[in-house]
Regions:
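Conserved small/polar residues in nucleotide/adenosyl-binding loops
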Residues: 403-405
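Exposed beta-strand-loop-beta-strand "reactive/processing" segments of non-cytosolic proteins
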Residues: 7-75, 120-160
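Long, charged/polar, surface-exposed segments that mediate recognition or autoinhibition
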Residues: 57, 61-63, 69-123
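Core alpha-helical transmembrane segments of integral membrane proteins
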Residues: 184-372, 378-388, 392
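Membrane interface segments of multi-pass transport proteins and intramembrane proteases
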Residues: 391-401
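Conserved structural-core and active-site-/substrate-pathway-adjacent residues in large, well-folded domains
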Residues: 1-2, 77, 104, 161, ...
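Extended, hydrophilic extramembrane loops/domains of integral membrane proteins
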Residues: 149-184
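Short, solvent-exposed cationic patches
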Residues: 94-114, 179-208
Length: 405
């Protein structure tokens, strides 16, 4: 569909490459769910098909070229607008405002599937480019006024004699944007403090201190933990980023070379993977050393699935129990969300049940597996093994029966 769309513009020839990504505009959702009827109203907006907050974005680009195209499609594949980036010095016959508006009215549905008769012109403007070309901009508003101060709008621009953009969007009041920014700032402050507490106090303070004590007392057990950390960092960070290679070109600046951009991306992936390796290694070593000291009779985690241990009744019981506890944990999470939303006014925004961007990756099945791999290892080590084992050792050291398991 994107290839067919780009062929309608002479300035986008067959030599242009394409990249795609699934995009969501959350501004209208935030306004509607908080101020204008909640999730039911937002679902109604999606169903009436006047405005689509979910879209596939397809980019047509070429190395060294300023000219590029961005085509937008609804989830069902119908066209939902586009934007052609045209250089200021591009020569094209200039039109009067009346002729430019007539051109828009005649051709706007070529790459947009809305009903243009439901829109009224509310604003128009023009700008003269350095080469004398006249560019026009027209802003339309939908007749339906059922979302309070928010509005369904459509912007069309004409560069010379080319309709270079048709952009449907939702206008959200500036007052709400400021209010929402204040809400987000509180959440961001909490997140910053939590990250500081996690990295500064929990990981660096407790983790590094524990490693030093283990090393001095000969308790340090790290070889297999380091190998596990390297495995997780490689498969859950570096390779998962490489899996999204087709989508990274959405951020490519055509003013630079493709080789330079790709080198920068690869270096960033490797650097992030190395950083994650050190964090994982410190977490795994701390967890293994603590649990071996606190629970010397427990099965060592890295030997669980070895041939002479995996067939034991203890491993079978632990595995069955782990699966049986999953529905209990899911029920607790669900109950927490329901309690917070209904009784304490917490807001949980609506979102897709899955991320279609997985389909744009090289191996769609791999990303979910990689994320689960890291979460399963790291959360088990850092948020279960470390605090439980530390509590046991503290209890043994100070004879505190409440935390002496």
């Amino acid at each position: 569909a994107a290839s067919d769309a780009s062929t309608q513009f002479e300035i986008l020839d067959d030599s242009f490459e394409q990249a795609s990504i699934y995009n969501f505009d959350g501004s209208l959702r935030n306004f509607v769910e908080l101020k204008q009827g909640g999730k039911e109203k937002f679902q109604e907006i999606i169903d009436n098909d006047i405005y689509s907050p979910y879209n596939w974005m397809v980019r047509s680009y070429k190395e060294g070229e300023i000219i590029e195209g961005m085509f937008q499609f609804k989830p069902d594949g119908s066209p939902n607008g586009y934007r052609i980036k045209i250089p200021e010095d591009y020569d094209s016959d200039s039109l009067s405002e009346e002729d430019a508006l007539a051109l828009v009215e005649q051709n706007i549905n070529n790459q947009w599937s809305g009903n243009f008769s439901d829109y009224n012109l509310i604003e128009s403007s023009f700008k003269e480019m350095p080469n004398g070309r006249i560019d026009h901009s027209f802003l339309f508003e939908h007749n339906l006024q059922d979302i309070g101060e928010a509005k369904y709008r459509l912007r069309a621009t004409v560069s010379g004699s080319i309709i270079n953009s048709v952009s449907p969007f939702a206008f959200v009041p500036e007052s709400f944007k400021r209010e929402f920014a204040n809400i987000r700032s509180d959440n961001d402050t909490i997140a910053i403090f939590a990250n500081f507490a996690f990295l500064g106090i929990y990981l660096l303070g407790i983790g590094v201190t524990s490693l030093i004590i283990f090393y001095r007392n000969g308790w340090l057990r790290g070889k297999k933990s380091v190998l596990a950390a390297a495995f997780v960092a490689l498969f859950s960070n570096i390779l998962v980023n490489l899996n999204f290679y087709p989508t990274i070109w959405m951020a490519y600046d055509t003013a630079s070379s493709k080789s330079q951009f790709l080198s920068e991306q690869l270096l960033g992936m490797v650097a992030n993977g190395i950083l994650m390796f050190f964090i994982l290694a410190a977490s795994f070593i701390t967890a293994e050393s603590l649990t071996r000291k606190a629970f010397p009779k427990h099965i060592q985690i890295w030997k669980t699935w070895s041939s002479n241990v995996a067939n034991s009744k203890r491993v079978l019981n632990d595995t069955i129990f782990a699966y049986l506890i999953v529905p209990i944990k899911l029920a607790l999470v669900g109950a927490f969300y329901i309690l917070m939303e209904r009784n304490f006014g917490f807001w949980s925004p609506a979102s897709s049940s899955f991320d279609p961007n997985y389909l744009a990756s090289i191996f769609p099945w791999y990303t979910g597996l990689a994320i689960s791999l890291q979460a399963g290892f790291w959360e088990e080590m850092l948020f279960r093994a470390v605090p439980i084992a530390a509590g046991v050792l503290i209890g043994q050291r100070y004879n505190l029966s409440l935390i002496h398991i």
